Amino acid sequence: MRSEPTNAAGNTTLGVTSVLQSTSVPSSETCHVSYEESRVVLVVVYSAVCLLGLPANCLTAWLTLLQVLQRNVLAVYLFCLSLCELLYISTVPLWIIYIQNQHKWNLGPQACKVTAYIFFCNIYISILLLCCISCDRYMAVVYALESRGHRHQRTAVTISACVILLVGLVNYPVFDMKVEKSFCFEPLRMNSKIAGYHYLRFTFGFAIPLGILAFTNHQIFRSIKLSDSLSAAQKNKVKRSAIAVVTIFLVCFAPYHVVLLVKAASFSFYQGDMDAVCAFESRLYTVSMVFLCLSTVNSVADPIIYVLGTDHSRQEVSRIHTGWKKWSTKTYVTCSKDSEETHLPTELSNTYTFPNPAHPPGSQPAKLGLLCSPERLPEELC
């Protein structure tokens, strides 16, 4: 068990003390870090993610489910992403309580393992699903004609299931790790195995996905830029969307993965000098925790960029809101048959018709990524 002495400055000993010699780890295996330095920032950010992410992802899940039922391929990835985000957000209050309670976990080791498992799975499921979304858009835009007969919902479901299964298996060793009585997954003392794991996470969990996102979004914008049927404003809209996708990815995930890389590199540099490694990790503790927390902001940014920020989603939300107002009015106000017939054309017009000069009269609104003609691309991508 790790000790938990805390001084007035909020410094807490992490590691194994000589109190429990049965662990066969000497007392020098302790590092001193400050929990108080990051407490306020972590609580504020996690609280904001919970308050904003819950309604945003609930609405996103509903909107994308409607598109899934209409056989939309891209919506499958977005729906899976929103479900994963909702599962993670449901555990955020536990982290807030843990941090506010000076990093003391009172819910038992199994609850700690499940919560941590969901936390880390969500990070990498989100990253890989974002890559799937960008690749699907890339195929739908750059190879619109060639991919038309090859993009199927069944394929999207299979890929999403494989992503979730792969990440789940990679993180499954979490359940085999020993969890201390009062702590829940505090940073472990660096060793060669953990350093190698950090290198792999940086390479396959960040660097390669970043390359995929940058390449696909650049190619999408390049393809749109060459189109003669789009206005400058429409092209700029696609450009801003592509830049936003890569920027949010960098802001949310780059800091934490860079810290992982630095930690692993420091272990290699000090060549097993545990005192030096411990001192270095202690200095990085606050930064590491803040950057890990920052990665969860992705749970709020993704639904806004990919779904809620699109023109069609705003129209759908407006339609639902108008329909709700109409239903509420009919619930409390009884109208005569003649009155209903008189106002029916107006009600239908206000509720269900969304004039759009880009669509021929009587056409249906474009789905999220299904229609890929040059005239419809900006609406799909933005």
UniProtKB/Swiss-Prot annotation:
<feature type="transmembrane region" description="Helical; Name=6">
    <location>
        <begin position="242"/>
        <end position="261"/>
    </location>
</feature>
<keyword id="KW-0675">Receptor</keyword>
<dbReference type="GO" id="GO:0010972">
    <property type="term" value="P:negative regulation of G2/M transition of mitotic cell cycle"/>
</dbReference>
<feature type="topological domain" description="Cytoplasmic">
    <location>
        <begin position="66"/>
        <end position="76"/>
    </location>
</feature>
<keyword id="KW-0472">Membrane</keyword>
<keyword id="KW-1015">Disulfide bond</keyword>
<feature type="transmembrane region" description="Helical; Name=4">
    <location>
        <begin position="156"/>
        <end position="175"/>
    </location>
</feature>
<keyword id="KW-1133">Transmembrane helix</keyword>
<feature type="topological domain" description="Cytoplasmic">
    <location>
        <begin position="222"/>
        <end position="241"/>
    </location>
</feature>
<feature type="disulfide bond">
    <location>
        <begin position="112"/>
        <end position="184"/>
    </location>
</feature>
<comment type="similarity">
    <text>Belongs to the G-protein coupled receptor 1 family.</text>
</comment>
<keyword id="KW-0807">Transducer</keyword>
<feature type="transmembrane region" description="Helical; Name=5">
    <location>
        <begin position="199"/>
        <end position="221"/>
    </location>
</feature>
<feature type="topological domain" description="Extracellular">
    <location>
        <begin position="1"/>
        <end position="42"/>
    </location>
</feature>
<feature type="topological domain" description="Extracellular">
    <location>
        <begin position="262"/>
        <end position="286"/>
    </location>
</feature>
<dbReference type="InterPro" id="IPR000276">
    <property type="entry name" value="GPCR_Rhodpsn"/>
</dbReference>
<feature type="transmembrane region" description="Helical; Name=3">
    <location>
        <begin position="114"/>
        <end position="135"/>
    </location>
</feature>
<dbReference type="GO" id="GO:0000082">
    <property type="term" value="P:G1/S transition of mitotic cell cycle"/>
</dbReference>
<feature type="glycosylation site" description="N-linked (GlcNAc...) asparagine">
    <location>
        <position position="11"/>
    </location>
</feature>
<dbReference type="GO" id="GO:0004930">
    <property type="term" value="F:G protein-coupled receptor activity"/>
</dbReference>
<feature type="transmembrane region" description="Helical; Name=1">
    <location>
        <begin position="43"/>
        <end position="65"/>
    </location>
</feature>
<feature type="topological domain" description="Cytoplasmic">
    <location>
        <begin position="136"/>
        <end position="155"/>
    </location>
</feature>
<dbReference type="GO" id="GO:0005886">
    <property type="term" value="C:plasma membrane"/>
</dbReference>
<feature type="topological domain" description="Extracellular">
    <location>
        <begin position="176"/>
        <end position="198"/>
    </location>
</feature>
<keyword id="KW-0297">G-protein coupled receptor</keyword>
<keyword id="KW-1003">Cell membrane</keyword>
<dbReference type="InterPro" id="IPR017452">
    <property type="entry name" value="GPCR_Rhodpsn_7TM"/>
</dbReference>
<feature type="transmembrane region" description="Helical; Name=7">
    <location>
        <begin position="287"/>
        <end position="309"/>
    </location>
</feature>
<dbReference type="InterPro" id="IPR005388">
    <property type="entry name" value="G2A_lysphc_rcpt"/>
</dbReference>
<comment type="function">
    <text>May be a receptor for oxidized free fatty acids derived from linoleic and arachidonic acids such as 9-hydroxyoctadecadienoic acid (9-HODE). Activates a G alpha protein, most likely G alpha(q). May be involved in apoptosis. Functions at the G2/M checkpoint to delay mitosis. May function as a sensor that monitors the oxidative states and mediates appropriate cellular responses such as secretion of paracrine signals and attenuation of proliferation. May mediate ths accumulation of intracellular inositol phosphates at acidic pH through proton-sensing activity.</text>
</comment>
<protein>
    <recommendedName>
        <fullName>Probable G-protein coupled receptor 132</fullName>
    </recommendedName>
</protein>
<feature type="topological domain" description="Cytoplasmic">
    <location>
        <begin position="310"/>
        <end position="382"/>
    </location>
</feature>
<keyword id="KW-0325">Glycoprotein</keyword>
<feature type="topological domain" description="Extracellular">
    <location>
        <begin position="100"/>
        <end position="113"/>
    </location>
</feature>
<keyword id="KW-0812">Transmembrane</keyword>
<feature type="transmembrane region" description="Helical; Name=2">
    <location>
        <begin position="77"/>
        <end position="99"/>
    </location>
</feature>
<dbReference type="Pfam" id="PF00001">
    <property type="entry name" value="7tm_1"/>
</dbReference>
